[in-house]
Amino acid sequence: MSQITEEQVKHVALLSKLEFSENEVKSFTDTFGKIIDMVEMLDEVDGEGVPFTMNVADNLNFMREDVAEKGLDREKLMAAVPEKEDGFIKVPAMLSDGGDA
């Protein structure tokens, strides 16, 4: 089994601003190790002569024409906002320290 450490899982969690219990860290460490093992197994598969497949399903991306449309009336929007600051809508902080990830 590939070695991914609990410290690595904790580091990624910290960068992602996520908090996990010790049981969750152990579980993620085991799961990520299994995923890495599976990817390494796929790396060993001989794909020589196998035709390249762009899409395993016959689905296509259907894109609409990009058409500019009139947006909301700023004055009406700002009148409906409960809290504003310097002309912007003020919302609660998503990050506890307010800093970068």
UniProtKB/Swiss-Prot annotation:
This is Glutamyl-tRNA(Gln) amidotransferase subunit C. The keyword Nucleotide-binding applies. It catalyses: L-glutamyl-tRNA(Gln) + L-glutamine + ATP + H2O = L-glutaminyl-tRNA(Gln) + L-glutamate + ADP + phosphate + H(+); L-aspartyl-tRNA(Asn) + L-glutamine + ATP + H2O = L-asparaginyl-tRNA(Asn) + L-glutamate + ADP + phosphate + 2 H(+). Disulfide bonds: none annotated. Belongs to the GatC family. InterPro entries: Asp/Glu-ADT_sf_sub_c, GatC. Heterotrimer of A, B and C subunits. GO terms for biological process: glutaminyl-tRNAGln biosynthesis via transamidation; regulation of translational fidelity; translation. HAMAP family: GatC (MF_00122). Keywords: ATP-binding, Ligase, Nucleotide-binding, Protein biosynthesis. It holds the Pfam family GatC. The keyword ATP-binding applies. Allows the formation of correctly charged Asn-tRNA(Asn) or Gln-tRNA(Gln) through the transamidation of misacylated Asp-tRNA(Asn) or Glu-tRNA(Gln) in organisms which lack either or both of asparaginyl-tRNA or glutaminyl-tRNA synthetases. The reaction takes place in the presence of glutamine and ATP through an activated phospho-Asp-tRNA(Asn) or phospho-Glu-tRNA(Gln). GO terms for molecular function: asparaginyl-tRNA synthase (glutamine-hydrolyzing) activity; ATP binding; glutaminyl-tRNA synthase (glutamine-hydrolyzing) activity. It is an enzyme of class 6 (ligase).
